[in-house]
């Protein structure tokens, strides 16, 4: 009951953003730097998709202009209100032709999906990426060891994503396709950690 109330509150874009600032201070700067570094190693992409975009794309901070896709109509409406195209849809059945995008991104989505759906979503992202393009996935992972990062462990346990994984478990979701390169790093003052992974098609 309490969880449902919290989830409904997080449907409001300003509460969604505020919760991120409170629970993950410093995350925006660190993650932006990491992704910026990664972009220097990747080919230029013109047609970009952000899967699980939320009410606004993280990629906007990097002056990228993706099409957004999210299961929440509230989020895609807000995304569209900012002047960018967005589609309401499911990550495990992306409504695009094979090879349609130069790059496909997913930031903070997979821990909201059970293993079978997450695997299918990754498969779909690769399917709609053109040969020579790339897929980038960033997702949270459980702290290891938990006792060294108690604040991060607690935040992860309270996360509305019900499928928070260890690094090994997240990498196993990706392992159906060979060639993923992943980097684990801490990205907030509360000790939150994530895995930034790229796949060149």
What is each residue range found by the language model?
Residues 132-140:
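Conserved beta-strand signature within the Rossmann-like core of class I S-adenosyl-L-methionine
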Residues 105:
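A conserved beta-strand element that flanks and buttresses the S-adenosyl-L-methionine
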Residues 119-131:
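A short glycine-rich, Lys/Arg-flanked "PGG" loop and its adjoining helix->strand segment in the class I
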Residues 162-178:
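Short alpha-helix
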Residues 179-190:
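Conserved S-adenosyl-L-methionine
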Residues 144-160:
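Short, glycine-/aromatic-enriched active-site segment of Class I SAM-dependent methyltransferases
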Residues 49, 54-93:
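Class I SAM-dependent methyltransferase SAM/SAH-binding core
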Residues 2-33:
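Class I SAM-dependent methyltransferase Rossmann-like catalytic core
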